[in-house]
């Protein structure tokens, strides 16, 4: 447990060359955390900022599939932390929702590229004690919530890691043993807005349609007016 760091992902990738297996990096305070597309990840005191650094089996695709492993592990850990009354769902590509609001996010970063991916940092942020101000998020984005705010449960970051780490290990073993198919099926069973209208935005386009699922690579499948689209990377917004 680090008292303070700029980014647990950056810290984890510094450790990677000396690792033979995997390791978790956890920080009480993270002052330069990042989300997707370089966005700042705001971390109020008492929240979870952690990274698992590991060497993936395979290249870039296998590394990317760890995002789905992380989402399933978060779903399980949050289920234990929040209790049976909590409504949890996974939002493509990298968020976990609690009672309809964003409670956790995932960011993968790697060293090396293509078939030469040397290490992957699976960064995970969870709003345990508090959520960022809703006014700080992009218009139309899912509003942030916290575990304590939604359930009244006070969960320490180290206690949460005790729930998350074994859950990640279980799902990673599924991926390593059986491939992506069971991970994909489990993810779809927990997916938010499956079969419902969504909006997928890339840097240059916006697509409206029905969220039909994900393909064997984890890409979004959208059924719109022009037919079926497979979208490898985008931001998803609900409604419309």
Swiss-Prot record:
Its EC number is 6.3.4.15. Residues 1-176 form the BPL/LPL catalytic domain. The keyword Ribosomal protein does not apply. It holds the Pfam family BPL_C. GO terms for biological process: protein modification process. GO terms for molecular function: ATP binding; biotin--[biotin carboxyl-carrier protein] ligase activity. It catalyses: biotin + L-lysyl-[protein] + ATP = N(6)-biotinyl-L-lysyl-[protein] + AMP + diphosphate + H(+). Biotin binds at residues 7-9, 30, 34-36, 102. Disulfide bonds: none annotated. Belongs to the biotin--protein ligase family. This is Biotin--[acetyl-CoA-carboxylase] ligase. It comes from Paracoccus denitrificans. The gene is birA.
């Amino acid at each position: 447990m680090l008292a303070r760091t700029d980014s647990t992902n950056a810290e984890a990738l510094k450790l990677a060359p000396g690792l033979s297996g995997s390791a978790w990096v956890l920080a009480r305070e993270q002052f330069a955390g990042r989300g997707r597309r370089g966005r700042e990840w705001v971390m109020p005191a008492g929240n979870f900022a952690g990274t698992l650094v590991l060497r993936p089996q395979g290249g870039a695709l296998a590394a990317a599939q760890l995002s789905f492993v992380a989402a399933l592990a978060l779903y399980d850990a949050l289920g234990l932390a929040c209790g049976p009354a909590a409504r949890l769902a996974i939002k493509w590509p990298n968020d976990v929702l609690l009672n309809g609001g964003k409670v956790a996010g995932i960011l993968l970063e790697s060293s090396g590229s293509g078939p030469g991916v040397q290490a992957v940092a699976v960064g995970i942020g969870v709003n345990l004690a508090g959520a960022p101000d809703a006014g700080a998020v992009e218009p139309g984005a899912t509003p942030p919530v916290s575990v304590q705010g939604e359930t009244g449960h006070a969960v320490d970051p180290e206690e949460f890691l005790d729930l998350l780490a074994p859950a990640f290990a279980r799902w990673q073993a599924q991926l390593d043993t059986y491939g992506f198919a069971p991970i994909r099926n489990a993810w779809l069973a927990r997916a938010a807005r499956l079969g419902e209208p969504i909006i997928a935005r890339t840097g240059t386009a916006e697509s409206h349609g029905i969220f039909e699922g994900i393909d064997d690579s984890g890409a979004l499948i959208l059924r719109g007016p022009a037919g079926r689209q497979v979208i490898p990377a985008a931001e998803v917004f609900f409604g419309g």
